[in-house]
């Protein structure tokens, strides 16, 4: 059997399948061993891949596009989740629904600062494009090295609101220091919140990647069909949150699947144009430079499940 160990970089994002694969037998059942390394952000994973430290990463697609533009030979070989960015604000801040339009919602932040994870992360790009689209040059953006810092920054008034993962909204709800101001489906339709990305030299290990993708697909389906059991495993694996917190995070944006359908790819290519306009990349990176579809089409040949939701929602 082909080389059995994969060096994997992942984030603290608990709805990624990384924690589920770490805490279950899904990889071992497929004769795969993995070394896991936690990173603060997608751009940090890209830097580690560039340094030769990783074979595979769990990453939002904008950092991948930026890495390819800089000469890194990467390929997105599977999806995982879409629409994983929310905006959270202080409890007294009017929400998008209360404001009635995105323009009115953003207007209230004139002269204030909004927070996001590091520059080049998917949350950073979505927020900056939103401000550009609505001509809000009077709103500043502050990037934080870890997404985990955003909740405290809202509490202290350092920032007025933040763009981040659904866990940010779950934290705000649990501790009462903020609330969900813009839900994930109102920001960027079908945005590729994360995919499975490898160095292209890994594509030669077809058997190993096929077994990994089989495990990843099984984990995505597990989240969809038994989120409570998955939440128990993830909570135990992280050792930092309880199952109820994980379950709430799952439900804020319940759009899980391993497939790479046309909608996922089209949304990614929209990011290419946005990244170019924002000056993050020097050229229009091509679709075939970003994606390698052969493996996941073999593992998941049918229709995608991103819009099918999860049990209990």
Per-segment meaning from a language model:
Residues 2-129, 133-134, 160-166, 181, ...:
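Short, glycine-/small- and polar/acidic-enriched structural segments
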Residues 29, 96, 186-187, 255-264:
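Short, solvent-exposed loop/beta-turn-alpha elements that line the ligand-binding surface or hinge
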Residues 32, 72, 136, 240-241, ...:
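Helix N-cap/coil-helix junction residues
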Residues 149-236:
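Pocket-lining segment of extracytoplasmic ligand-binding domains
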Residues 205-282:
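Secondary-structure end/capping motifs
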Residues 275-313:
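Conserved C-terminal helix/tail region of periplasmic/extracytoplasmic solute-binding proteins
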């Amino acid at each position: 059997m082909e080389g059995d160990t994969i060096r994997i970089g992942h984030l603290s994002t608990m709805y990624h399948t990384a924690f589920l694969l770490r805490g279950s037998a899904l990889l071992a059942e497929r004769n795969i061993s993995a070394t896991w390394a936690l990173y603060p952000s997608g751009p940090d994973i890209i830097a580690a891949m560039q340094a030769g430290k990783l074979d595979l990463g769990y990453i939002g697609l904008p950092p991948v596009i930026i890495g390819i533009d800089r000469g890194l030979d990467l390929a997105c070989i599977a999806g995982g989740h879409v629409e994983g960015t929310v905006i959270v604000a202080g409890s007294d801040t009017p929400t998008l629904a209360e404001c009635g339009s995105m323009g009115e919602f953003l207007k209230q932040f004139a002269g204030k600062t909004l927070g996001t994870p590091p520059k080049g992360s998917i949350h950073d790009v979505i927020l900056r494009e939103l401000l550009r689209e609505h001509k809000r040059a009077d709103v500043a953006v502050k990037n934080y090295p870890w997404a985990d810092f955003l909740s405290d920054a809202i509490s202290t008034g350092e920032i007025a609101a933040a763009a981040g993962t659904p866990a940010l909204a779950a934290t705000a709800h649990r501790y009462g220091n903020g609330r969900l101001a813009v839900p994930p489906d109102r920001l960027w339709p079908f945005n590729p919140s994360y995919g499975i990305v490898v160095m292209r030299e890994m594509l030669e290990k077809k058997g190993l990647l096929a077994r990994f993708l089989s495990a990843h697909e099984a984990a995505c389906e597990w989240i969809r069909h038994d989120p409570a059991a998955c939440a128990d495993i993830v909570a135990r694996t992280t050792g930092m949150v309880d199952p109820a917190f994980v379950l709430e995070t799952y439900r804020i944006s319940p759009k899980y699947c391993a497939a790479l359908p046309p909608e996922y790819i089209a949304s990614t290519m929209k990011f290419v144009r946005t990244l170019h306009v924002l000056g993050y990349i020097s050229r229009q990176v091509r679709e075939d430079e970003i994606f390698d579809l052969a493996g996941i089409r073999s593992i998941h040949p049918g229709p995608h499940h991103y819009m099918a939701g999860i049990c209990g929602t």
